[in-house]
Amino acid sequence: MKKIKVVCGVLVQDEKVLIAQRATGDSIGKFEFPGGKVEIGESNEEALIREFKEELDIDLTSVTFLEKCVDHQAGKEIELYCFLCFADQKPEKCIVHSQLVWTTPEHIYDYDFFESDRTLVQKLMEVWPCMKKPMKSKF
């Protein structure tokens, strides 16, 4: 069985996350976290940074591993590595997706995701309360 490594990023800004709607292919209209395939010689983090630059024209400032999912499709094993990521800017245009949506975790279930991305949504909901900015100590 052929293995394919894929990365995706949960871009967080202003207590919202970015999701993207597929514009082409068998899964047209489904939502996903932006990302793509890892190229030969690339680390997962390098691939994610490259994909965000290519697909969203933004530079990531921070990337932290969140979860790994394995999916089987058409005789292929797809390893999906998901990262929490941050950037100083927001994407201004759709390059490969039909639309980009900023949503709160409370409304993320309103969107039709790929099965593997649904697993990532669950993981995001588990860690979201920990992502609030810590209070400053008086000490």
Question: Which residues are covered by each model-predicted region?
Answer:
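A short coil-to-beta-strand element that immediately follows conserved catalytic motifs
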Residues: 58-68
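Conserved Nudix-box catalytic region and its N-terminal flanking loop in Nudix hydrolases
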Residues: 13-54
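Charged phosphate-binding loop/patch that engages nucleotide di/tri-phosphates or the phosphate backbone
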Residues: 116-139
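Conserved N-terminal beta-strand and adjoining loop/helix that marks the start
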Residues: 1-17, 68
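A generic structural signal for short hydrophobic patches within well-formed alpha-helices
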Residues: 38, 108-109, 121
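Active-site-adjacent beta-strand/loop module that shapes the phosphate/pyrophosphate-binding cleft
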Residues: 69-92, 101, 105, 117, ...
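Conserved hydrophobic "DFG−1" position in protein kinase catalytic cores
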Residues: 11-12, 19, 85, 102
